[in-house]
Regions:
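Short coil/turn residues that cap or connect secondary-structure elements
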Residues: 55, 142-145
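Extended, non-catalytic scaffold segments that flank or surround catalytic motifs
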Residues: 24-26, 71, 97
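A hydrophobic/aromatic-rich effector-binding and dimerization subdomain
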Residues: 2-19, 77-143
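Short loop segments at secondary-structure junctions
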Residues: 46-48, 71, 92
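Histidine-centered divalent metal-coordination motifs
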Residues: 34-36, 74, 90
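Catalytic metal- and UDP-sugar-binding loop of GT-A-like glycosyltransferases, i.e.
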Residues: 44, 68, 87-89
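Generic protein-terminus/edge-of-domain signal
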Residues: 1-61, 65, 102-119
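Short beta-strand His + acidic residue motifs that chelate non-heme Fe in jelly-roll/DSBH
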Residues: 50-52, 68, 73-80, 85
């Protein structure tokens, strides 16, 4: 698994040879204001949290999915047993496929420049199961590669 290093509140992978990582974690309390040099897709599995991104604060609940782009500053202000998955990656992980991937439904909003304010998706039950299965499979592949 990729390990994160902290320098001046900017997170980065220590191992750029494998530019994708799946992490699951539980937040409780506050997670300091920070940014990173990679894309972060976040899925909230359980719990709830107040989250700040680009000076906008919102409540996150189970089933929420959102993206943090490189350089965006964000923090979990008040997390209450928030269990989440992070899919962390660099654009080079898409290795030449990024122009095709961006054409897929919803991907231009995730990978392109923000056209408007920070947004999140709230998944229905079937979508949650599908996302969770995919994340768990990716996590297993990461550990067993």
């Amino acid at each position: 698994m990729a390990v994160l290093g902290k320098e001046e509140n900017i997170l980065d992978f220590e191992d750029r040879d494998f530019p994708i990582a799946i992490m699951d974690t539980e937040h409780h309390g506050k997670v300091w204001l920070h940014s990173h040099s990679f894309f972060e897709i976040v899925y909230i599995d359980k719990g709830f949290s107040m989250h700040s991104c680009n000076d906008e604060t919102t409540i996150l609940t189970s089933g929420d999915l959102f993206t943090i782009r490189p350089g965006e500053v964000h923090a979990y202000i008040s997390a209450h047993h928030t269990y989440l998955y992070n899919c962390l990656f660099y654009m080079e992980a898409l290795d030449g496929f990024s122009s095709e991937i961006v054409k897929l439904p919803g991907m231009s909003q995730i990978l392109g420049e923000r056209q408007s304010k920070w947004e999140k998706l709230h998944l229905d039950f079937a979508e949650r199961r599908e996302v969770l299965l995919c994340l768990e499979k990716m996590k297993w592949e990461q550990v067993n590669r």
